[in-house]
Every structure is written in C-alpha cells, then in structure tokens.
Amino acid sequence: MQYKIKNAVQIKKFSDYYKITVCKNITKGKKSTKFVPKGKGGNNKKLSNSISRSKKQVLEKALCNEWLWFATLTLDPKKYVRDDLKTFIKDLGQFIRDQRKKYKDVKIKYLLIPELHADGKNWHLHGLFSDIPIADIEPHPLKKLSEKGYINWVTYQDQFGFNSLGAVKDPVKCSMYITKYISKDLDKAVTALDQKLYYCSRGLKTAEIVAQGRLTQPINFKMAFEGLYSKSQFVDDYEFFKCYYIDDKF
C-alpha cells in the first residue's frame, strides 16, 4: 500500500560534494495495480519521467567521477553514414576498447550524450573522458580552437572525423552543463531508433545516500534550486543542516 511523506529530506554524497534535497511530498510503498488507459497524457508523463531520470543519472555519474576532458565527437561523411547512431556507438565502443588494449596504463572512461545536428538527421556526441592517450593527441588544427587550449584526438579523427577536447576546469559547472543535452526531442529521436539517452563506461561511481528524514522546522534560507515540488542545493558539508531535520529511514 502506498503512503505519502511530507517535507522529506535526502542527502547524497557526490565525491567532494553533498546534495541536500527537500521534497514537499514523496510516495513510498507498493503501488496497487489498476487499469490506466493509453493516451497522450500517459505518454507525456512517461517521457517526462524518462528525461528527468536520465538527467539525474548523468549528473550523478558526472559529479562522482574524475574527468579531464569535455569532448565533442562528430562523423566525417566520407567515412561514416552520419545518421546511423547505432553503428556510430557500436564502432566507437570498439575503438575505445582497442585504445585501452594499446595503452594499458591509460584508464579511459567516458560519459557521452548523443545530439542531432541542426538538420534533425545526423548525429554527433558530447561528453566527458577521464583520460586520453598522450601519444594520440595534438594541438587542435583549427587555430580558433587551439588558441583556447582545445586538442585533437588524432586516432579518433583518422577513423571517425572531426573532434575537439577541452580541459574540464570547473567539474560542477561542466556536469550541470552536459545535462542540458538530454531533452524531449532527444528522447523521441533515440526512442524511435531504439537507442539510449546517454552512454557510459561500466563501473562508474554514483552518489551515495548518507542521510534521509523529515523537516522539523521551516528552512530560513533560499536554496540554489527551488521548484514547485522540491528544492535542492550542493554544499561542501551538511553539518549545518542537521538542525533542520530528524533522521528517518522511511
């Protein structure tokens, strides 16, 4: 049987940060089975939940792991059919496995999100890499990019096409930024192709729940994000927040 918990608090540890989240209501317990007719409303809710869930997963993986490079990976039409996302992902996965075998001391991990070009047909990828073999990189051949510190992954260019990698300078801002690529349009596009909203290495770290409970008094400060149903904020330490809630395992 389902039941609601008001003013629920959850605190998660993200590597060097903590995220405090307060929800007006959360639903716990087993949902009773009932008939729900198919229709536009149900599909829209399912779509919204898929996007929200994927954004949270990407943010967790981005914040809980160490990344050196923000990457944009494209396809050269002379080398690949640019609208074939399935083949792109499959071959890129094999390419990365080959790189790991060749450079065994380089731990290549990735978190990538597909995006359609403005033409609504062809694909490229944005995302994060933990490391790239030094022997395989060079200053970017485009002057406007090399002047900003971007590099070129030479072996990727040889097999796939244009790419650019920039150093991750602010992990939190970069992690927040990449979630913007997960959108309603992307969900529809990848669903039609039976593909995913994002791709990542196995074994990436995720956030750990370190505390949860219920508010015991109103919060007397504004949190960084405040929506209709929840509010949240990243902090270095949550000791100051302990006076606002009581522990509860739900």
What are these regions (language model features)?
Residues L125-F129:
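Cys/His-coordinated zinc-finger cores
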Residues M1-K121, I132-F250:
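Right-hand nucleic-acid polymerase module
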